[in-house]
Amino acid sequence: MANSIQVREVSAGYGSVQVLDRISLSVSDSETVALLGTNGNGKSTLMKCIMGIVYPSAGRITATIDDVEHDLCGLATEDIVALGISLVPEGRRLFPRLDVEENLLLGAHRRAARAQITRNLAFCFEMFPVLAQRRKQLAGNMSGGEQQMLTLARALMTAPRILLIDEPSVGLSPLLVIHTIDKIRELKERAKLTILMAEQNFHQAIRIADRGYVIVHGRMEYEGRSRDQLADNELVRKLYLGM
C-alpha cells in the first residue's frame, strides 16, 4: 500500500519572521528524497511543518498512508505520529539519563507500535548491533555516532510508514557520516520506508537519494529528478562544489 507526502505552496515562519515562502515538494511511495540546503534556509522548519510542530501560514500538507489521504495541517504532532509518520530530529534529543532500551521503548507510544514492541525492538537491535551490545548503557554516555544510531532506532519503534530525517550528519566525523548514510539506505531497503531527508552534506545525500530539492532562503530553487541532474545543476555546483 502506498505511503507518500505532498507539500503544496506552504509558507511558514516564527512570529513576524517568514522562513518558508510557497514551498512545494512531493515524496512518492518508497522514495528517498533529499532536501538540500545550507544552514538557516528552512529545511528544519519544513520538517516541523509536516510534523505539526510549526503551523503553516498558507498552503497545504497531505500524506497518503496505506492508500488513504490525510490532511496534516491543523493536526497535533501526536496524531501525525499515530498516522505513521516519524521524525528523526536534528541534534538527536535523547533522554541522557535513560539507558538505550528505555529510550527505544519511549518511541513505541503509537498504538500499532505498542502491539509490536518485541518485534520492533528485535529489528532495531538487528539493524544496529551496537545498541544491542549497550542496551543498558545510559544514552548520555554514548558517542555521537552511537547516539545517532539510537535516534534512528527510536524513530523505528513507532512503526512508521514515512520517515523524516533532519540533518543526520551534524556533529559526526566523516567516517561516521558515511556509516550513518549507509544505515539509512539499508533501512529504506529493509523496512520499505518512504524517506524525506534534510541534509547539507550534498555528497553523502546524493549517494542514497532517488532525487532531491534545493532550498535557498526559504524558497525551493531547484528540483533534480535524478542524482545526475542534481550533480550537474549550476546552482548545486555553486552552493556545494565551489564552481
Predicted regions and their residues:
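ABC ATPase C-loop
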Residues: 155-156
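Helical segment within the ABC ATPase nucleotide-binding domain
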Residues: 178-192
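Conserved ABC ATPase signature
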Residues: 138-142
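ABC ATPase NBD Q-loop/coupling interface
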Residues: 60-81, 226-227
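The feature captures the beta-strand-to-loop junction immediately N-terminal to the Walker
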Residues: 36-38
